[in-house]
């Protein structure tokens, strides 16, 4: 009975050690926004992941499906890459502290189903987050530049090899 109890305790300790704590980035020292970008799933083989980049250049990629990294992966960006990322997204940023949603039936007339959704979130200190939610099935011409910017993010941050599925799986 004693051995059985010890095995239960050992198993509980192992499970507690694998509790799946979410990796976090250090709080940035440099002033600026931490930008989170999430690519949601589609009804196909679209890479699904979330990433965060701080103004200090720290990045964290958290894969969900169809990426070439098996788990949370840290990366760094140069100050120029961070500025380019921030500037490319600035034109789509909603009013500070608000959420803007671009989706079928709300502000999109031409919509294709089964496409991934994207979320871009800007946070700084304790201020309320600013968030843009974009359903990429929205094919309105007015959102063409947003679609192109989203498609360029992996190259912009030099993580395209991490978010594309490997050729052999």
Q: Can you name each region flagged by the protein language model?
A:
Residues 5, 18-43, 94-169:
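Short, well-ordered, aromatic-rich surface patches in folded extracellular/luminal domains
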Residues 53-57, 76-86, 122-128:
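A short, structured loop/turn motif at beta-sheet edges
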Residues 26, 31-69, 73-74:
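N-terminal secretory signal peptides
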Residues 61-98:
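A short-motif feature that recognizes glycine-rich, charge-decorated loops
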Residues 54-58, 72, 80-81, 95-96, ...:
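Short, low-complexity, polar/charged sequence segments that are solvent-exposed and flexible
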Residues 1-16:
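Sec-dependent bacterial lipoprotein signal peptides
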């Amino acid at each position: 009975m004693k051995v059985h109890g010890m095995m239960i305790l050992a198993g509980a300790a192992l499970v507690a050690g694998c509790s799946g704590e979410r990796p976090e980035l250090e709080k940035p020292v440099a002033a600026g926004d931490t930008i989170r970008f999430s690519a949601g799933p589609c009804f196909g083989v679209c890479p699904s992941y979330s990433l965060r980049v701080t103004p200090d250049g720290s990045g964290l990629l958290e894969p969900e499906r169809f990426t070439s990294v098996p788990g949370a992966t840290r990366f760094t960006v140069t100050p120029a890459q961070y500025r380019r990322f921030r500037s490319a997204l600035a034109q789509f940023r909603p009013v500070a502290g608000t959420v803007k949603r671009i989706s079928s039936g709300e502000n999109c007339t031409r919509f294709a189903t089964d496409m991934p959704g994207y979320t871009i979130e800007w946070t700084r200190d304790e201020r309320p987050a600013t968030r843009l939610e974009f359903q990429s099935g929205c094919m309105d011409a007015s959102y063409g530049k947003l679609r192109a910017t989203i498609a360029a993010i992996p190259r912009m941050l030099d993580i395209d090899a991490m978010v594309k599925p490997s050729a052999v799986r």
